[in-house]
């Protein structure tokens, strides 16, 4: 059974969440038989140092293979939070194509870290995911077009602009 500490770094109702509180919830879900613990920044207020502190608490109770990260990009910290998580050994993350998503009970919260940004980071670190970045960028452009919005992925937007600049000009 998978469980999550959904507001491990900040709560829209109580504000900041301490590492002690995260560990208390992690212990409780472990006691009821949850075998995978997601550490989530659902409203996107986490920073790398605080993410590492929360993860270190979860990793006291679960092996690294049973802990995952879920980071929204409200304040532009999601990719830094993924990197900070990698530094403590995490290797499982939730991400969303084109950075889609949000949080209905947290005004202004954006979607999860964009899959394209995570793939670019991992590739830059020499980590082979077996996932085609170009394919994900194409998928993000398609779904964003259907939704009538621009992708929020910095990587996706940069690669789309690079492709457009490299395309031969149309003759008139």
Task: Locate each region found by the language model.
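Catalytic cores and adjacent flexible loops of soluble metabolic enzymes
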Residues: 1-172
């Amino acid at each position: 059974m998978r469980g999550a500490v959904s507001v491990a770094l900040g709560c829209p109702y109580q504000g900041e969440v301490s590492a002690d509180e995260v560990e208390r919830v992690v212990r409780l879900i472990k006691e009821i038989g949850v075998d995978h613990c997601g550490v989530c920044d659902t409203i996107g207020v986490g920073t790398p140092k605080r993410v590492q502190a929360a993860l270190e608490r979860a990793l006291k109770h679960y092996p690294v293979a049973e802990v995952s990260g879920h980071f929204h990009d409200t304040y532009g910290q999601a990719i830094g939070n993924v990197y900070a998580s990698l530094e403590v050994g995490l290797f499982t993350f939730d991400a969303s194509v084109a950075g889609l998503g949000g949080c209905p009970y947290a005004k202004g919260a954006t979607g999860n870290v964009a899959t394209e940004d995570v793939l670019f980071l991992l590739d830059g670190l020499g980590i082979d995911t077996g996932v085609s970045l170009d394919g994900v960028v194409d998928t993000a452009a398609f779904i964003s077009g259907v939704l009538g919005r621009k992708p929020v992925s910095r990587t996706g937007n940069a690669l789309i602009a690079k492709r457009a600049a490299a395309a031969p000009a149309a003759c008139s």
